[in-house]
Amino acid sequence: MARFRPSRSRSRSLYRRRRRSRRQRSRRGGRQTGPRKITRRGRGRGKSRRRRGRRSMRSSRRRRRRRRN
C-alpha cells in the first residue's frame, strides 16, 4: 500500500497547481467578494513564484557560462 501513496500525493499536487491558476483568475475578477483573503493568499503565491523564477534564472545563467567557457 505504501507504493500507491506517493503516486496519489503527486497527482493531487499537480491538480492543486492547475486549480490554483484557475482560481486566481476568478478571484482577481471578483475582489468584491473577499479582498482580505485575496491579499493574503496572493502574497504567498507571489513569493513562491518569485523564488521559482529566481532559481530558473540562476540555472540558466550557469548553463550559459558553461557554454561560453
From Swiss-Prot:
Coiled coil: none
Cystine crosslinks: none
Tissue expr: Testis.
Any single Gene Ontology cellular-component annotation: nucleus
Keywords for this protein: Chromosome, Developmental protein, Differentiation, DNA condensation, DNA-binding, Nucleosome core, Nucleus, Spermatogenesis
InterPro entries: Protamine_P1 (IPR000221)
Main location per the UniProt record: nucleus
GO biological process: chromosome condensation; sperm DNA condensation
Region (Disordered): 1-69
Compartments where found: Nucleus; Chromosome
GO molecular function, one term: DNA binding
Biased composition (Basic residues): 1-30, 37-69
Family: Belongs to the protamine P1 family.
Job description of the protein: Protamines substitute for histones in the chromatin of sperm during the haploid phase of spermatogenesis. They compact sperm DNA into a highly condensed, stable and inactive complex.
Protein name per UniProt: Sperm protamine P1
